[in-house]
Amino acid sequence: MGSFVVGAVGMANAQKIDAKAKKILDDITANYNSKKNSYFKFSFGSGLNGQVTKTEPGIYYVAGEKYKLKIMDTEQIFDGSKIYNINADDMEVTIAKPNGSSTMFSPINYLTTYRNDYNVTYNGKKMVNGVNADFIKLTPVKTNGIKYVYLFVDSVKKQMVKLEQHGTNKDVAVIAIKEYKENQELDPNMFVFDKNKFKNYIITEL
């Protein structure tokens, strides 16, 4: 499931950000940041040669800097200090400090990374999942394994609709948001990693 991992960066170039696209993304970011927490239910599609060949369900909870992302048997938790990658298939957990290469492809991660890492262009309107969405294209300023990213957003509701990540190796990863909720009463331990629940797992701290 490496296709939803954002890669490390290489050579630098001058960044270009379209003003209209920036305002749309900034408005969406401000909307999500104004909430106590947000919940996304989505489908995650992956494949080769630009074609999605596999689709899996996913969920994403975020509150401030903390988040929990789950796609099938792979889960990632960030408790504000460390990232916990949990793989139920392999019964393994890796624990690490956050960095660009350890960030999974989530419904909103590009709302942060575009500010420094991508050239941004506004490409007009496109109907996506019944929404007349604004179409924004990101291309990396530095070599990072990604060819381009398409963001489809509802600028009226100030919400994400769909994301497409296309790799230089022709891998594709797509998140289509199916349901969104905000300001829920979450379990206090939502973003806590409890080692006692993973006694039979191999736990590695990097």
Model-derived features with residue positions:
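Sec-dependent N-terminal signal peptides
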Residues: M1-F4
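N-terminal leader/targeting segments and the immediate start of mature chains
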Residues: G7-V52, E65, K197, I202-L206
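Flexible, surface-exposed loop/linker segments and immediately adjacent secondary-structure boundaries
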Residues: P98-V131
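An acidic-aromatic
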Residues: P57-M104, A173
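Beta-turn initiation residues at beta-strand->coil junctions
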Residues: F44-S46, I71, N87-A88, E164-G167
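Gly/Pro-enriched, hydrophobic low-complexity segments
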Residues: N123-K125, N129-F198, I202-L206
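Short, surface-exposed charged micro-motifs
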Residues: P57-I59, T74-E75, N119, Y148-F152
